[in-house]
């Protein structure tokens, strides 16, 4: 599979980057312990909060100890986690990772996690009592998300049956089509015409606009407009609940 250049990625992710730059205060991307340390020294922050979606899952995180705020070890600051997630109810840390992260987490002022299973994992493996809290996406009301959609002047969605499928397969596709036919709905997705897992070098070089991911508010509007939603992921379920689908 072709890996686009930095310049090509800036085009492919332009809608996502627009949302981040407009609505989220952020640093430059950080790729190492040294960069985390530099950011901390430059920012002179009073508190650090880590979270949320699978931030404590080793297979998804190449600098796991930094997700336990190792770069603040010598600082007199507040350390908290909000809705941190292990992404699984099984313990995936190596013995060494467990020792390092337990020592770091025990220095936190407050530990909250996204799942009940996370409470158990923290207690059993890291020696910390954690609190189960809401996913941060559920801290906002439906009206807050609709306000974003309106600010961006997002046009109406192209269908009535929104399918947000992260792991597509023929069985899921068949099910979506059957539901659409039975309910008289028009299925639609919010994805690039040329999806990442299938795109080639030729696709990126000759039709890069087809590789561009739709905007965040396009995705939010899909939940708002749809008469019915079919999803296979946690956040798909969450936004279905938020928009009463």
Give the residues covered by each predicted segment:
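A short beta-strand/loop micro-motif in the catalytic core of glycosyltransferases
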Residues: 108-115, 230
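Structural loop-to-beta junction motif characteristic of Rossmann-like glycosyltransferase folds
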Residues: 244-245
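Nucleotide-sugar donor-binding and catalytic loop/hinge architecture
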Residues: 41-44, 72-76, 145-160
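An anion/phosphate-binding loop that grips the pyrophosphate of nucleotide cofactors and donors
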Residues: 45, 108, 226
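Acidic anion/phosphate-binding donor-loop and adjacent secondary structure
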Residues: 90-94, 138-152
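Catalytic donor nucleotide-activated moiety binding site of glycosyltransferases and closely related
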Residues: 81-88, 119-122, 165, 172-215
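Donor nucleotide-activated moiety binding/catalytic core segment of transferases
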Residues: 130-138, 142, 200-232
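Aromatic- and Gly/Pro-rich donor/ligand-binding loops
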Residues: 1-103
């Amino acid at each position: 599979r072709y890996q686009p250049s930095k310049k090509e990625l800036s085009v492919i992710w332009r809608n996502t980057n627009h949302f981040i730059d407009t609505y989220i205060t952020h640093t430059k991307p950080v790729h190492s312990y040294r960069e985390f340390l530099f950011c901390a020294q430059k920012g002179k922050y009073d508190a650090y909060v880590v979270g949320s979606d699978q931030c404590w899952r080793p297979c998804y995180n190449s600098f796991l100890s930094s997700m336990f705020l190792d770069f603040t070890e010598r600082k007199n600051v507040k350390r908290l986690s909000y809705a941190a997630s292990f992404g699984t109810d099984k313990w995936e840390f190596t013995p060494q990772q467990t020792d390092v992260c337990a020592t770091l987490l025990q220095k936190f002022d407050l530990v909250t996690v996204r799942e009940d299973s996370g409470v158990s994992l923290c207690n059993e493996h890291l020696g910390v009592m954690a609190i189960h809290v809401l996913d941060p996406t559920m801290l906002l009301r439906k009206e807050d998300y609709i306000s974003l959609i309106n600010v961006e002047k997002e046009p109406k969605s192209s269908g009535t049956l929104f399918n947000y499928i992260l792991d597509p397969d023929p069985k899921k596709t068949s099910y979506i089509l059957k539901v659409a036919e039975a309910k008289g709905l028009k299925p639609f997705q919010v994805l690039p015409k040329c999806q990442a897992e299938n795109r080639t070098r030729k696709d990126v070089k000759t039709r890069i606009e087809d590789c561009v991911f739709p905007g965040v508010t396009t995705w939010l509007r899909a939940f708002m407009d749809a008469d019915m939603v079919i999803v296979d992921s946690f956040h798909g379920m969450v936004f279905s609940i938020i928009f009463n689908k």
